[in-house]
């Protein structure tokens, strides 16, 4: 596996591959890779001749500097995992390489990017679109792979792909969960064993809420009240939304696809965890 740090080197390498008629898959990551990322990489390896995995902790999508500072950085271990998964290229640029000057581009796709994470983390999705659009431009992939854990992020990037006319296929891959049901996340490494056990309640109550036959408001209240009742967990938001537009719904008949998206603070630090459940 090649480890590339420069955009020009990446583009030269991929140009050669493309001239040979090879297909290219891109898996954008921020590093601190786990089994969820590995599943995306393996899918790309099976679908494409060449798989590029970007490892870049993107500062423009963090509105909280402390969150950026404590995000795990594990490049050596990440590269070992990628090699085991069969990736051909790890692209690990510096911040200066990606942003030699401040990126002043603005992306706006309401309501998809203005609710939930967009409301709680102003500027977050603008930063996501900045970096992902750059990565798409550098690699010109046939396919790009994203994990469904970040459900809203996928919806926003789909809007951006349509808006900017990228000729690629977006591939959404299922959430990979720990045995407890907790969605795998790089942030899980920041949890103590006790906090990790607490966090398993998030998906447990989401899953249970699909079986109770409640209306939308009752379902919302059931999830929030039960999670908030556990010491060490605090719901920041739980939104039941149209699975395509992410607009909030009031009735199960309001949309063909319905998803519940949640963010919960866990533990004393606290660590912010996201998850979702499909209702319809």
Region annotations inferred by a language model:
Residues 2-232, 241, 245, 277:
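Nucleotidyltransferase catalytic core that binds NTPs
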Residues 222-280:
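Phosphate/ribose-recognition catalytic cores of enzymes acting on nucleotide-derived substrates
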